[in-house]
Design a protein with these regions (language model features):
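Secreted glycan hydrolases and related glycan-binding modules that recognize and/or cleave
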Residues: 1-167
């Protein structure tokens, strides 16, 4: 379906996938795309089949369960490493077999603009977001950018998140 959509819209338009509450997670089985009730890893097969058609992925770095607390730099690192299919921060994790991961140039991390924009436990203080950006730079990891949910809450929060994300 995504390949046909790409063909129909051509290369002049971008195809951006923003999976809500869907995650790539090395700690669970690799489900098929039609397995009902599975938010974890069913998207791996979508990526395998249609990555060449997709310009950007914007996974939420919130509202998804990982083995580290939300709102922390380790949560951001874990989301990033899992979507890239690099070894996660948990010692027992292993990359998903036969899966290249999402290229950093295609990955945008979805973050909350304030505690009011979603689950407060998943809000990243500007200092945490800055620490994550520094970690990316230190490790020479590529990231296309951030998707901030949403601009209304960011404005009410003094543009704290967009100011950090655009540095």
């Amino acid at each position: 379906m995504l390949l046909q959509l790409r063909e129909a819209i051509g290369k002049q338009k971008m195809l951006i996938v923003s999976p809500e509450c869907v995650t790539v997670y090395q700690g669970v089985p690799d489900y098929s795309a039609d397995t009902p009730g599975q938010a974890y890893n069913y998207f791996v097969n979508v990526i395998r089949l249609a990555d060449q058609a997709i310009d950007l992925y914007q996974p939420q770095a919130y509202n998804n369960w990982y083995d580290v607390p939300g709102g922390t730099v380790n949560y951001l690192k874990d989301v990033y490493l899992n979507w890239r299919n690099y070894k996660g921060i948990m010692d027992w994790m292993k990359p998903i077999e036969n899966f290249e991961g999402v290229a950093g140039r295609k990955l945008m991390m979805g973050v909350l603009a304030s505690t009011s924009a979603g689950g407060a436990a998943y809000y990243y203080q500007p200092s945490v977001l800055q620490e994550f950006i520094s970690w990316l730079s230190e490790n020479k990891y590529e990231l296309n950018g951030f998707m901030i949910w949403d601009s209304h809450w960011d404005s009410l929060n003094g543009n704290a998140i967009s100011n950090i994300a655009t540095q």
